[in-house]
């Protein structure tokens, strides 16, 4: 009986040591924090919630005196690294963000090699790419105004072709925000409709 208790105690101790080792290993992994990514991507005062891609997740980075986010598929041929958000824009408002890219230069109007693209509801809106080898394009501010108010599925993706890696090989994104004041809607006024009757009461106030 004593021998059984001893082996049981040893087994429990070994299990606890194993669990502790697994937890420690997990804590040391570089797991991106959504709150940190949101803070890096949003402009001051903006509260957009972003979803990070699982294959090549975006990362928080300090660059050019700002805290921003960069794509995570550097050196991965035929890959895409995307970050997305559901954004509601009212009438009179627009979406604004800063973006930059440092990758393989693209030449020609129709060539799309390594580039950072902005997509809304599955439609390519605009994209940027490097124009010189090992030289970032530089930060640019882009503003998009929808045709009508609504909630839109937005995505920023750094897409790579099958060959050539240049520079930092990534796209950068920062200062995402909905800007502008919502349009004011005039309050409806009641107007007499045809066929309605109105009664006027007269009262004699003379002494």
Spans of features found by a protein language model:
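Sec-dependent signal peptide cleavage junction
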Residues: 20-27
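Ser/Thr-rich, Proline-interspersed low-complexity disordered segments
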Residues: 24, 183-195
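Extracellular glycan-recognition surfaces and repeat-rich motifs
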Residues: 28-68, 206-207
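Short beta-strands within extracellular/lumenal beta-sheet-rich domains
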Residues: 68-89, 137-143, 173
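Extracellular carbohydrate recognition
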Residues: 77-80, 109-111, 160-181
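Extracellular beta-strand-rich recognition modules
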Residues: 93-103, 151-160, 205
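Short, surface-exposed beta-strand/strand-loop-strand elements in extracellular ectodomains
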Residues: 109-122
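Extracellular carbohydrate recognition and processing domains
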Residues: 123-149
């Amino acid at each position: 009986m004593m021998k059984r208790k001893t082996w049981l105690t040893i087994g429990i101790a070994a299990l606890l040591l194993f669990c502790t080792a697994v937890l420690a290993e997990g804590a040391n992994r570089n797991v991106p924090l959504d709150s940190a990514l949101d803070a890096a991507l949003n402009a001051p005062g903006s509260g957009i919630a972003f979803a990070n891609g699982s294959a090549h997740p975006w990362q928080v980075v300090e660059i050019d005196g700002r805290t921003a986010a960069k794509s995570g598929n550097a050196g991965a041929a035929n890959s895409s690294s995307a970050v997305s958000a559901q954004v509601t824009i009212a009438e009179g408002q627009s979406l604004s963000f800063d973006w930059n890219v440092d990758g393989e230069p693209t030449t020609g109007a129709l060539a799309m090699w390594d580039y950072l693209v902005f997509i809304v509801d599955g439609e390519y809106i605009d994209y940027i790419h490097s124009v010189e080898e090992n030289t970032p394009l530089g930060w640019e501010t882009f503003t998009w105004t929808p045709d009508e108010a609504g909630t839109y599925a937005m995505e920023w993706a750094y897409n790579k072709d099958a060959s050539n890696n240049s520079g930092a090989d990534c796209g950068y994104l920062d200062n995402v925000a909905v800007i502008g004041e919502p349009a004011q809607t005039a309050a409806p006024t009641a107007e007499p409709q045809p066929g309605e009757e109105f009664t006027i009461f007269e009262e004699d106030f003379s002494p």
